[in-house]
Amino acid sequence: MDKENSDVSAAPADLKISNISVQVVSAQKKLPVRRPPLPGRRLPLPGRRPPQRPIGKAKPKKQSKKKVPFWNVQNKIILFTVFLFILAVIAWTLLWLYISKTESKDAFYFAGMFRITNIEFLPEYRQKESREFLSVSRTVQQVINLVYTTSAFSKFYEQSVVADVSSNNKGGLLVHFWIVFVMPRAKGHIFCEDCVAAILKDSIQTSIINRTSVGSLQGLAVDMDSVVLNAGLRSDYSSTIGSDKGCSQYFYAEHLSLHYPLEISAASGRLMCHFKLVAIVGYLIRLSIKSIQIEADNCVTDSLTIYDSLLPIRSSILYRICEPTRTLMSFVSTNNLMLVTFKSPHIRRLSGIRAYFEVIPEQKCENTVLVKDITGFEGKISSPYYPSYYPPKCKCTWKFQTSLSTLGIALKFYNYSITKKSMKGCEHGWWEINEHMYCGSYMDHQTIFRVPSPLVHIQLQCSSRLSDKPLLAEYGSYNISQPCPVGSFRCSSGLCVPQAQRCDGVNDCFDESDELFCVSPQPACNTSSFRQHGPLICDGFRDCENGRDEQNCTQSIPCNNRTFKCGNDICFRKQNAKCDGTVDCPDGSDEEGCTCSRSSSALHRIIGGTDTLEGGWPWQVSLHFVGSAYCGASVISREWLLSAAHCFHGNRLSDPTPWTAHLGMYVQGNAKFVSPVRRIVVHEYYNSQTFDYDIALLQLSIAWPETLKQLIQPICIPPTGQRVRSGEKCWVTGWGRRHEADNKGSLVLQQAEVELIDQTLCVSTYGIITSRMLCAGIMSGKRDACKGDSGGPLSCRRKSDGKWILTGIVSWGHGSGRPNFPGVYTRVSNFVPWIHKYVPSLL
C-alpha cells in the first residue's frame, strides 16, 4: 500500500462527528461541469484519482453588472430614427398609390356596333327613357361586360354603354355602343384596336353546319359580319354619351318627298354638333350639302364628317370635308341611317353648314341595252345615285349588244379612265369587261374605252373605302375595223383628232400621244410660209439664223390656245411672256407679281461637284416628319411650298401636324427658319399606283420673314403649257441618298446637273409616262435624284432673263442613277391653273 493510502487509514481513532463543520454551497456554481475530453487527452485510469488543482489562492469573484435604464438618450435616438424611416416609407407608398391612380392611367374609348337578329325593332327603342330601350340596353351591356371581364383585358375593363338602338334594312336591331378601358399609361402601347375587336368577335359562337354569319353571343343572335369596333375619341364619347352633348340632334324621316333642313352657324365660340339621321326601313338617306364654312387645315380642327352609322366609327366614314366649299355635293348611305358631325372648336370667323337630307329608295344599278346599228354615241350610263357621290361596296352590271358583228361598244368618260389591272389592285373601282379585269382612275380630261365585240358584259365593283366621285359615261357603237373617221388620228386616250393636228406642238389628245414620235420640223426661215410651224415660233428659242422665228412676237393677234393673254384681253404669239423680265403687255400684266428668283446672280455653284454652297438654292426646303427628314419641297411664296403628292399618301402622312418645313438650310439641323405645316393639299386626281398627278401644296403656319430674303427666295412657276427642249441643262437638289445602296441621306445639300430627256424616249423607256410627267437625267446613269429627294425641285435657268424656273418635281423612277433609266418628274407647267386656285397671289 502506498504512502497516501497509509495516511488515510492512519486517521485518529478518537475523531467525532461533532468536530466536523459542514459548508453548504450551490452545486450549480461550485461543482465542476463534466465536459467531454479533448481530442488527444488521456482519461484517468479507473481507480486512480485525477490530479487535484493546488489549493493555494482563491479565485476572485466577478463584479456584478450595473443596471442601465432602458429610456436612455442612445435608445431614444435609435427609436426616433426607426420611426422616421417607417413614416417615410408610408408617405412614399401613399404618394405612389396616388400618382398611379391619378396621373399614370389613361382611358381608352372604343365605338362599335353589331346587329342582333332575334329581336325585332320596336318604335319605343327610339326613346332612351323608355322601359324597352333600358331593358335591351341592360341586356347588351351585361353581355359585353361578361365578354371582357373574362378576357385578357379584364383588369383594364371599365364599362360599356349602349348609345343607340335602331332599325336597319337587314332586319333585327342595330346596336351602337361604347366600351371604356382604363390602364396605366406605361402599358398603353400594348393596347391594340384589333385585339379588342378580336375578343368580341371570338366570343360569337357560329355553327359550322349551317354555314351562316349569325352566331350566339351569350344568348344573343349576332351577325358576325356586322361587328365593327374602332378606337374613338374622348370628345366624341362625351358629346354622344356624356353631359357635353353640345348641339346633338336626332331626326327620324318617313316622308319621301320632303327635304329636311340641316343648318347651323356661329361667329364665335365653338361648334361640336352631331346629327343622327334615321329613315324608315327599306330606304336610304341622301345628304345634300349646299355650303360649308370652316377653317381649311386638313381636318385637324375643323371638319364635316359623314358616317354610315349612328356613332363616329372610323371604319364607317363615308366622306370627310376639310375645306370650305359652295359647290353642291350629295352623299348616299348604304343603310337607313347616317351620322353627320360638324366640328369647329375655335371659331375665328363665321363657321357653319347649310344642307338638307331626304329619304330615297334603293336603286339597282343594272341595265341591258340593245345598241343601234349606226355608229356614234346614243345614251348614258352612270354610277349609282348619280350625280351623288356613290357609296362604297356598290355594284353595277350592264349588258350591251349590237345586231352587227362588225360593230363594237365604245364608252366615253368625261373624267375617268380604264386601264389594265395590275397586281396592286384598284383604288377607284375595278371593272370586269368580257372576263378581263381593269382598274378605273379619275383625271381631268375625256377618254374613250372600246370593246371590239358585239356582245359586252360589264361589271363595276366599287372598291373605294369611302364614297367616290360621281361617274358618267356615254355609250354607243363603233366600227371595229376603223375606230376613228378617215383623216383622223387615234389617241392613246381613245379620242380621235384631225390628222392635221398631229405633231403640231399642241397636246390635242390630252395624253400627248399626238406629239410623240414626231420629227422636229425645221422652219422655212427664208419663205413667207414659215409661220405655219407654230411650235417653233416665239417659243424663246432662236431656230432661224436670222432670228426671224422670234420677231414680232408681241404683235396683237386673235386669241387662241397658243397665244399669251394679257390682263386687258390682248393676245400675242410670245409663248413664255410671264415674268421673263420684259414688259410685253400694254398694261404690264405679264410682269406683275414677279418677285421670284430675284437674286440669281448671288447663286454659287461647284460645277462638277456634289456639295453646294450655303444660299446656293434658296428655294430648297427639307420637310421633316416627326423630326426626321422625309421629303423635299420648293418655296413658291412666303407661306406656300410645292412638293410631291406621294410624300403625303396615307392617313398618317396626310396629317399636317407631324410635319415641319426647314427653310434656308444648307446642313441638316441648321435651318435659318422652321415652321410647322398648317395645311396639305394633295391633287384630287393623284394616283398612288401610277404616280400621275403627283403634286401637292403645303401652307406654312408662319410665313418666313423678309429679313431672310438673301437665304430664302421663291422659285418662279413656269407659264401654263411651257415647252421645254430635250438636252436642256437643269439641276436637281436635295438631301437624299448619294447612291442607291446608301442607308441614309446626306447631311449637306447635294446638287446634280441633269439633262431634259426627249418625251418619246421617256415613253419608250417606261411605257406609263403621261403628259403630266417628264424625264431628266443622264442616260449613262451617273447623275440622278435618289430616295429622300422626293418632292424637291428640278430647277432650270431661263436664258432670256437668268431666272430659275421650277420645271419639275422629283417623283419616281426605276432605281436611282441606273443606266438608261432617267428620273421621272412631275411637269409643273401642266398644273399652273391648279396652283393659282390655292395661291392666287402668284397670278
Curated annotation (Swiss-Prot):
Domain Peptidase S1: 606-840
Post-translational modification: N-glycosylated.
BP GO annotations: proteolysis
Region (Disordered): 27-67
Keywords associated with the record: Cell membrane, Disulfide bond, Glycoprotein, Hydrolase, Membrane, Protease, Repeat, Serine protease, Signal-anchor, Transmembrane, Transmembrane helix, Zymogen
Family the entry assigns: Belongs to the peptidase S1 family.
Stated role: Serine protease which preferentially hydrolyzes peptides with Arg at the P1 position.
Protein name: Transmembrane protease serine 7
Gene of this entry: TMPRSS7
